Curated annotation (Swiss-Prot):
It comes from Canis lupus (Gray wolf). This is ATP synthase F(0) complex subunit 8. Component of the ATP synthase complex composed at least of ATP5F1A/subunit alpha, ATP5F1B/subunit beta, ATP5MC1/subunit c (homooctomer), MT-ATP6/subunit a, MT-ATP8/subunit 8, ATP5ME/subunit e, ATP5MF/subunit f, ATP5MG/subunit g, ATP5MK/subunit k, ATP5MJ/subunit j, ATP5F1C/subunit gamma, ATP5F1D/subunit delta, ATP5F1E/subunit epsilon, ATP5PF/subunit F6, ATP5PB/subunit b, ATP5PD/subunit d, ATP5PO/subunit OSCP. Belongs to the ATPase protein 8 family. InterPro entries: ATP8_mammal, ATP8_metazoa. Coiled coil: none annotated. The lineage of its organism: Eukaryota, Metazoa, Chordata, Craniata, Vertebrata. One of its GO terms (cellular component) is mitochondrial membrane. One of its GO terms (molecular function) is proton transmembrane transporter activity. It is found in: Mitochondrion membrane. The keyword Transmembrane helix applies. The modification N6-acetyllysine is found at K54, K57. It is a single-pass membrane protein.
């Protein structure tokens, strides 16, 4: 049974990781990141939801009359 030649595995794996690292660095460097991001206020004022004006009742199955 022949032996598996693993002498080039280190170079291949190392070059793969190096290439992936460089590609990700190039991809990330193309994005614009603001220097001082403003924090958003957690308080939302004046937002109107269509379901706020409606009165709804959730019926429990046990409270319905028997059929």
């Amino acid at each position: 049974m022949p032996q598996l030649d693993t002498s080039t595995w280190f170079i291949m794996i190392f070059s793969m990781f190096l290439t992936l690292f460089i590609l990700f660095q190039l991809k990330i460097s193309n994005h614009y990141y603001p220097e001082n991001p403003m924090t958003k206020s957690a308080k939302i004022a004046g937002q109107h939801n269509p379901w706020e004006n409606k009165w709804t009742k959730i019926y429990s199955l046990l409270s319905l009359p028997p059929q």
